[in-house]
Swiss-Prot record:
Domain of life assignment: Bacteria
A Pfam short name: Ribosomal_S4
Species the sequence originates in: Geobacter metallireducens (strain ATCC 53774 / DSM 7210 / GS-15)
Family: Belongs to the universal ribosomal protein uS4 family.
Subunit text: Part of the 30S ribosomal subunit. Contacts protein S5. The interaction surface between S4 and S5 is involved in control of translational fidelity.
Span of the signal peptide: none
Protein name, as recorded: Small ribosomal subunit protein uS4
Function comment: One of the primary rRNA binding proteins, it binds directly to 16S rRNA where it nucleates assembly of the body of the 30S subunit. With S5 and S12 plays an important role in translational accuracy.
InterPro entries linked to this entry: Ribosomal_uS4, Ribosomal_uS4_bac-type, Ribosomal_uS4_CS, Ribosomal_uS4_N, S4_RNA-bd, S4_RNA-bd_sf
S4 RNA-binding domain residues: 98-158
GO cellular component assignments: small ribosomal subunit
Keywords, sorted A to Z: Ribonucleoprotein, Ribosomal protein, RNA-binding, rRNA-binding
Amino acid sequence: MARYTGPSCRLCRRENMELFLKGERCYTDKCAIKRRNYPPGQHGQGRPKVSNYGIQLREKQKVRRIYGVLEKQFRSYFEEADRMRGVTGENLLSLLERRLDNVVYRLGFASSRTEARILVRHNHFTLNGRKANIPSIQLKAGDVVVLKEKSRKIACINESLDAVVRRGTPQWLELDKEGYKGVVKLLPAREDIAMPIQEQLIVELYSK
């Protein structure tokens, strides 16, 4: 499956919630879900009855799109979460949250996960003092993410850092805005993920 390159707002309307795929626009009245709160397409406003399987599938698609992960990789995350101790659904969300691109977004260096992924791939960050340009790198407690010196004058990064006050930084992360540095204080718990996700539906889908 190829990466989706169409209109981001269309995905939000399809999942009937804000996925925050377009950065600051998602916090304004220009957000598509606020203007047209129904699925895209000719029959979008009809909202037909959805089966249990359809509900489970939509939940999985929603989470995939939030984190920008393709199906094969998402399935791998689920299988890894299933092997871990604890609750499979919570393990899955923890693995997704600990991706480097998501941590960069959560710290406020980018206004969206898509933007964070681009910044990571273009070598703007170091992880524990070493080059890190793979968005899917799994971070652990104690890891330190630093924006490189040459990248600290990039306007969009500084604008995102200024806006992070409104969005807030999760409890499991610590941001040193002046030093352009973030630290993973501890692994994210389920209560640290405030998005309306029903991870048990994903577990049920993959367990069939």
